[in-house]
Regions:
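Conserved functional hotspots at enzyme active or ligand-binding sites that engage polyanionic ligands
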Residues: 1-101
């Protein structure tokens, strides 16, 4: 697998299932650590302030920033896309508020 980049979308092994997720950790960390920070993309839409709407591979879903977690890079399988710039800014804004930074 090539370099894992922030805001790329991968299919990721998760408890015997493979689900889409967004990489949130910075590229500098992704280069040297064996794991990345990811947020799952879920089809179950909820009106939470930590959720961001996304359309990926023709399907509507939400990036669940409230469910972010570390994942070993070896669990990342197929890269299926990259998040659009406007959505990246929205994610960054929510993370700043979430962590009060």
């Amino acid at each position: 697998m090539g370099m894992v980049k922030r805001f790329d979308v991968y299919m990721c092994e998760n408890h015997a299932k493979i689900r889409p997720c967004v990489v949130l950790s910075p590229d500098e960390m992704n280069e040297v650590l064996p794991y990345v920070l990811v947020a799952p993309i879920t089809a179950n839409e909820r009106p939470f302030p930590t959720r961001v709407g996304i359309r990926i591979k023709g399907k509507q879903g939400q990036i669940a920033l409230d469910l972010m977690r570390p994942a070993a890079q070896v669990l990342l399988k197929e890269k299926i896309g990259t998040i659009p710039n406007a959505t990246c800014l929205e994610i960054s804004d929510i993370l700043k508020r979430l962590f009060a930074i």
